[in-house]
Amino acid sequence: MKIIVPMAGRGSRLRPHTLTIPKPLIPVAGKPIVHRLVEDIAGVLNQPIEEIAFVIHESFGKKVEEDLIAIAEKLGAKGTIYYQNEALGTGHAIMCAKDSLSGPAVIAYADTLIRADFDLDQNADSVIWVKQVDQPEAFGVVKLNEANEIVELVEKPATFVSDLAVIGIYYFKDVAVLKNEL
């Protein structure tokens, strides 16, 4: 199992905090956000993590790279660093880690701090984790059918579609399927 963490954004909404440290490395209760994120995911997966691939901006520097690799190693995984030096969207960020896009993987955006109970159906081809929210118009939301399958995904709906907000964590039984679509 792999975890892919796109985190090259500049964190402009959290300035001045992000002037000296990338947003995913801001400590919360003594640990960087990204560290908490990968620990939570590893706990849910209940299987060894082979690799954690971090997609960062080159300007983050060598110290950040070393810190990220150390986070991966604490979980018994290989830490890999990829670069996204131009903001060309989330699909592009994922493709920056194309050499790691094979086999089962979780893609997790490190720009949202959320505490949630995760569950993984490893028989599913893919999973999008969601959380019930009070203001769905502020988020991307999913609409489910009776079998709990996603039938619609709407970004910041003007009218009510659902109160299940996408939290930025996705599982793929074979992430190469996503790679081929990007």
What are these regions (language model features)?
Residues 2-8, 13, 19, 26-27, ...:
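Conserved N-terminal catalytic core of the sugar/cofactor nucleotidyltransferase
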Residues 110:
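Short acidic donor-binding/metal-coordinating loop in glycosyltransferase active sites
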Residues 14-15, 96, 153, 158:
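Hydrophobic alpha-helical segments, principally membrane-spanning helices and signal/leader peptides
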Residues 20, 69-71, 122-123, 144:
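Short, solvent-exposed amphipathic alpha-helical segments in soluble enzyme
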Residues 113-182:
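Conserved core of the sugar-phosphate nucleotidyltransferase
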Residues 10-13, 21-24, 78, 90, ...:
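Glycine-rich, flexible loop/turn motifs
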